[in-house]
Amino acid sequence: MASCPDSDNSWVLAGSESLPVETLGPASRMDPESERALQAPHSPSKTDGKELAGTMDGEGTLFQTESPQSGSILTEETEVKGTLEGDVCGVEPPGPGDTVVQGDLQETTVVTGLGPDTQDLEGQSPPQSLPSTPKAAWIREEGRCSSSDDDTDVDMEGLRRRRGREAGPPQPMVPLAVENQAGGEGAGGELGISLNMCLLGALVLLGLGVLLFSGGLSESETGPMEEVERQVLPDPEVLEAVGDRQDGLREQLQAPVPPDSVPSLQNMGLLLDKLAKENQDIRLLQAQLQAQKEELQSLMHQPKGLEEENAQLRGALQQGEAFQRALESELQQLRARLQGLEADCVRGPDGVCLSGGRGPQGDKAIREQGPREQEPELSFLKQKEQLEAEAQALRQELERQRRLLGSVQQDLERSLQDASRGDPAHAGLAELGHRLAQKLQGLENWGQDPGVSANASKAWHQKSHFQNSREWSGKEKWWDGQRDRKAEHWKHKKEESGRERKKNWGGQEDREPAGRWKEGRPRVEESGSKKEGKRQGPKEPPRKSGSFHSSGEKQKQPRWREGTKDSHDPLPSWAELLRPKYRAPQGCSGVDECARQEGLTFFGTELAPVRQQELASLLRTYLARLPWAGQLTKELPLSPAFFGEDGIFRHDRLRFRDFVDALEDSLEEVAVQQTGDDDEVDDFEDFIFSHFFGDKALKKRSGKKDKHSQSPRAAGPREGHSHSHHHHHRG
């Protein structure tokens, strides 16, 4: 079996290439003309001539050319029809009848011999097939496929065999035109190789220049540069093919260049755009890092300011601590003096201090004060210290009396609560009333005690408000300016006001203690101590009967009942009517929350904080209908005790419902005094609540007065109150 044409031994026509050849068969049989024809292409002058390329196509057609030097046109062309099956070609040797003669061999030699002026017919005219002969067919099969090693000794003349490479990769099929040009232009191939390398080098230099110009090589990151080198440099397989095979490089020169082998201008543009974008991102990152660095530096400088602020805060804290220590020391002194006063106090059987032992001390202070006024050589500083000590002692006494009255009031409230639950507490109420009456009597006796001068009594009333304002403000310098300007004036006023108080109290000795306290209070308020009158509010004496009502809302009524004895008494102000203190709301904090809780608890709807202007307008509208309420319209109960600086009612200190109830009770007192009946102001609460809560409040409170009239606890005080008023009018 013969091997395929891809084997190492392939039959080709001799060309101008200097390849190792060997002659098959005896060389003496060749004609001289044939030998000259074979040697003619090797002449230097005919090297660049055209040569005949005889190739075998897929159908086994042999192209032949004519030699102009032979002088005759060879009309005999051979055509071999071979059978190709896959990669195996079967060649049958010629039979016994097919003999090869010397003439035929010479003719074949002439056909294969190429003259110097042989024209290349490739690409000019299609190959023509000629009648075939058994001899030509055998020669064609010998050129198509190589036989075994035994066939190499076939006696053939004029044919040469080129030795193939023993160990090498399969060579690609080279086009005919490339093979012909490579055979005739060896130097041109080398020039093409150098030109291709120059083009590649120029592209590389161009890319590097662009990168240098754009600043890409100056960046610290090497990722984009490695990608550029991978894309700009040619494929290493192409370089290996150029160095290894010359035929492969010729094929690359003739064949169209693939777009992936060398980077195109479009790819370079995209790459440059990508690099520019990356450079822009890097610049943005650098700007962000710079901003963060500046911010960090600013944060590092901030602790200096914080340290200064901390130092200021420490200084303020130290000052506050020093002030607190001073206040604590002053408090210790006050406690020591208070203990001394309590030791001098003469207590009754029930433990209440009936009269203070301040008579000798007061006389001593007055006796010391007289010589001071007579001795001008004493400095003003000593006078100031003496006044401060005297005022401090008076303030301590007032504070002690206030604590005692507060405890009595708490006991009274607890007893009233027990009475409201149905417990038998009438005896306890009578006892508390008796204790309260004794306490008030003791206060009055303390002001009228022979051992205590009227000046000390007046000073007790005049200095209480003055000292309390100092206690809450905590400003020591305020005393200096006030005392310097009013020291002498205060001394002269003491004697005059003391004589006036003696006159007032002396003319009323035949009346009960409650009446004397009632008559003496307006004159104190006229002297400018309005807050002192408010503090004296809870110190109310019992009625003549010596018993208190069980209702907590009527504690303020004894003043009005005593005042109705004299029909010529002026109308009391709203401040006198609203003097009783009610319990603060529980379970809430803040004005808004307490107002909302009160509305939901008692009326089933939320209550917005009441404004001072709105309530004043409602009161004026209601009082305008009452002909006898002109004085009340001028003095509305809108004091800071019930409304804040922003004009909002203090729901967190007092329920608005209790406030309205107190207003209604005050109006009822005035109505009874003026008209003898309180039915005219029964709709006051409905008028106020309907404005703030709407019709729902009226429906919920529609049966309130009926229930109160049926309840013994609620009806008792009101009925007793009405009877007492009628009794007073009759008297």
UniProtKB/Swiss-Prot annotation:
The keyword NAD does not apply. Residues 270-348, 377-417 form a coiled coil. Keywords: Coiled coil, Cytoplasm, Cytoskeleton, Microtubule, Nucleus, Phosphoprotein. The modification Phosphoserine is found at residues 43, 129, 146-148, 567. Expressed in early hematopoietic precursors. Its main location: cytoplasm. One of its GO terms (biological process) is gene expression involved in extracellular matrix organization. Residues 698-707 have a biased composition (Basic residues). Residues 1-155, 354-377, 447-572, 698-731 are annotated as: Disordered. GO terms for cellular component: chromatin; cytosol; microtubule; nucleoplasm; nucleus; transcription regulator complex. Signal peptide: none annotated. The keyword Cell inner membrane does not apply. It is found in: Cytoplasm, Cytoskeleton; Nucleus. One of its GO terms (molecular function) is DNA-binding transcription factor binding. The modification Phosphothreonine is found at residue 152. It comes from the Eukaryota. Residues 364-375, 472-499, 508-543, 551-569 have a biased composition (Basic and acidic residues). The C-terminal domain (AA 443-731) contains a nuclear export signal. Association to the cytoskeleton through a N-terminal leucine rich-domain (AA 190-218). Interacts with TEX11. Interacts with ESR1, PBX1, PBX2 and PBX3. Regulator of pre-B-cell leukemia transcription factors (BPXs) function. Inhibits the binding of PBX1-HOX complex to DNA and blocks the transcriptional activity of E2A-PBX1. Tethers estrogen receptor-alpha (ESR1) to microtubules and allows them to influence estrogen receptors-alpha signaling. This is Pre-B-cell leukemia transcription factor-interacting protein 1. The gene is PBXIP1.
